[in-house]
Regions:
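A detector of single, family-specific signature residues
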Residues: 1-176
């Protein structure tokens, strides 16, 4: 009874591996800029290719921060007099790219994700966020991940995972 199911699972797993390999080949051959984006932990060929194909033109935005609005990872605002509540995210823009960025953010914040400034920031948000802190942190990290990917694409810089941490350490040495 289980043998046919196991064979089906093996067959599907093999098809997924073939598709992943094909996506990787397309990214390498037709979109070399994806290699810049894959420097970030949590970003593989699928997320990088989705980002490049969705945004299309790296010069489309004046500021990298605008990516958050474009993808729908910006909190909805409803200002009224003195009150400025932060509501849920807008969910405007491409839902597939938003999903991919959130998946990458889940990996970054998880235990398996390597130590980076983005992970430290996300974990700090999760700890100080109360009941829903982890989910809010994931969305915030997804937004920052989109901003980071756009910035790397525009500048062509090499990604430094602990850039802010290293700068703080250097400042402490200078001050001491």
């Amino acid at each position: 009874m289980l043998k046919p199911l196991l064979k089906e699972v093996e067959s599907l797993t093999e098809k997924i591996k073939e598709s992943d390999h094909e996506i990787e080949q397309i990214a390498r051959r037709d979109y070399p800029e994806t290699a810049l984006l894959e420097q970030v932990s949590g970003v593989g060929p699928l997320i990088a290719l989705t980002f490049v194909l969705t945004v299309e033109d790296k010069d489309r935005f004046q500021k990298s921060r605008d990516i958050g609005c474009y993808v729908g990872l910006r909190p909805r605002r409803c200002d009224s007099g003195q009150s400025q509540p932060q509501l849920r995210i807008t969910k405007e823009g491409d839902p597939y790219l938003r999903t991919m960025l959130v998946e990458g953010a889940h990996y970054i914040i998880s235990r398996r994700g390597p130590d980076t400034d983005l992970k430290r920031w996300g974990l700090h948000l999760a700890e100080s966020g109360g009941k829903r802190g982890k989910m809010k942190a994931v969305v915030a990290v997804a937004r920052k991940l989109g901003i980071l990917l756009h910035r790397l694409w525009v500048t062509g810089e090499v990604y430094e995972p602990l850039r802010n941490h290293n700068l703080r350490q250097e400042r402490k040495k200078i001050a001491a």
